[in-house]
């Protein structure tokens, strides 16, 4: 892509100054429309070492209210980031609606650098490319404007800048080992950058190659391209996004009405199995920590189905230093202002740890769908987006265990009445629970569709028959133990 690219003819200085003034004024006005229309803008600034990425960002942000933007310089990974999925450090930095985030280098720089230094196999590189394509598409599908710039300078220009920076003691620190390596292997790096850009150049998030030999000319190209992108985003905001066909292998699942709910276990047998299974799970927890295997256990189910008690029996077997339970309620304002998966990306476990979710990302295709908190296009896209999210976690090495806790309508009513009539349990019942119960049939339809469309081979659903809560607890423990034994051997 770089080899075929031709730089635009640089205008005269007077024209550059006039166009710069116009572009700056335009961006200053557009930022108010971005805030008003709640469009999040992610600007990725990539390019050669010493091409001036930081300087360009510094010039652009002078035209934006400081309350509306954030600049992130993506250096080396932190220890925590090394123990999270590849996209974690980028997903957690996406902007809120109505705001800008500027990334000084990002996922392109990381992938190409790892490839050039032999840290990625061909298979891993291909997976990273696919991850990036999904990530960028999910953002743009959900209303984000993603602008990707590559600042390009010739080999001799880079060498000249390195020499100039190294000559002054106050600037020598700005020359990194990677800058020097790039210049020594310029052709190899150029080929790698070109290949990456070809593979990730998409209509919804194209690459913009910028002639970065002259500072003011570079600034003008970036500003004019950015304002054009914003203009298009403002006019296209309400367009529906085409739905993608599922490409992931699905596991056949029964409808909820087909699940027999007469499963029971005797109290003595329950106590015996509970002790044995919890002891075994405790042993496996130690092993998965040593082998650095991350585990994600996701719970969904009817209100009063017994999710809390089920989670309590699993958590009771674990070392408290190695797991966390996340009760998921309605999103906070800062969560609602971002991509709906953001609050789950930011709660993922480290390698060797367990995250247990009491309610999950599946709220998108249940409560958000039925209560009108998102559009029909949003929740219909979400099945594929969730399958992609879980595939990303699976490819990272996570064990994903998903439970639907099933009861019938009569059992729910019995438990609701018990909660309402027992003072120490009244906190468990809310008006919302009763409202949801009135929509039982609609929820059952949504849950059936959810299970059918998201029970993949790498993250299948497990239905827990929970009219007898003790039976459901033992079944859940058995499944968790079996899944961990498969991975740990």
Indicate where each model-derived feature is located:
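Glycine-rich phosphate-binding loop of ATP-dependent small-molecule kinases
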Residues: 1-489
């Amino acid at each position: 892509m770089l080899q075929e690219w031709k730089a635009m003819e640089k205008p005269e200085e007077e024209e550059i100054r006039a166009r710069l003034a116009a572009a700056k004024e335009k961006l200053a006005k557009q930022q108010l429309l971005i805030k008003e229309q709640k469009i999040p803008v992610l600007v990725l600034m990539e390019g050669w070492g010493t091409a001036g990425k930081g300087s360009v960002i510094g010039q652009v942000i002078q035209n934006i209210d400081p309350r509306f933007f954030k600049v992130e310089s993506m250096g080396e990974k932190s220890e925590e980031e090394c123990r999270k999925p590849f996209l974690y450090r980028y997903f957690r930095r996406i902007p809120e609606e109505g705001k800008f985030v500027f990334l000084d280098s990002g996922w392109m720089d990381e992938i190409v650098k790892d490839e050039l230094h032999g840290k990625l196999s061909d298979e891993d590189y291909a997976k990273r490319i696919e991850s990036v394509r999904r990530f960028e598409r999910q953002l743009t599908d959900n209303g984000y404007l993603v602008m990707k710039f590559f600042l390009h300078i010739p080999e001799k220009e880079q060498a000249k800048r390195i020499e100039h920076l190294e000559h002054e003691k106050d600037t020598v620190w700005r020359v990194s080992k990677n800058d020097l390596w790039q210049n020594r292997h310029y052709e190899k790096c150029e080929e790698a950058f070109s290949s990456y850009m070809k593979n990730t150049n998409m209509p919804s998030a194209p690459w913009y190659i910028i002639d970065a030999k002259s500072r003011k000319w570079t600034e003008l190209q970036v500003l004019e391209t950015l304002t054009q992108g914003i203009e298009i985003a403002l006019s296209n905001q309400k367009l529906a996004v085409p739905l993608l066909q599922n490409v992931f292998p699905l596991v056949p699942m029964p409808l909820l009405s087909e699940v027999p709910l007469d499963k029971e276990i005797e109290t003595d047998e329950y106590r015996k199995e509970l002790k044995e299974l919890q002891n075994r799970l405790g042993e496996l927890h130690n092993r998965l920590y040593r082998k650095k295997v991350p585990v994600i256990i996701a719970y969904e189910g009817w209100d009063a189905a017994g999710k809390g008690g089920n989670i309590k029996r699993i958590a009771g077997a674990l070392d408290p230093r190695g797991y966390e339970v996340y009760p998921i309620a309605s999103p906070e304002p800062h969560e609602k202002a971002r991509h709906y998966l953001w609050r789950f990306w930011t709660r993922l476990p480290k390698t060797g740890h367990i995250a247990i979710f009491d309610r999950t990302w599946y709220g998108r295709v249940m409560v958000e769908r039925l209560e009108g908190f998102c559009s029909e296009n949003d929740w219909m896209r979400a099945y594929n987006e969730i399958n992609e999210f879980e595939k990303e976690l699976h490819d990272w090495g996570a064990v994903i265990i998903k439970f639907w806790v099933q009861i019938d309508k009569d059992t729910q009513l019995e438990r609701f009445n018990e909660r309402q009539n027992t003072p120490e349990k009244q906190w468990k019942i809310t008006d919302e629970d009763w409202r949801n119960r009135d929509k039982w049939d609609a929820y059952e339809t949504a849950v059936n569709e959810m299970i059918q469309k998201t029970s993949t081979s790498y993250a299948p659903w497990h239905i827990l028959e929970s009219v007898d809560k003790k039976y459901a607890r033992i079944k859940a423990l058995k499944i968790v133990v079996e899944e961990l034994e498969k991975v740990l051997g």
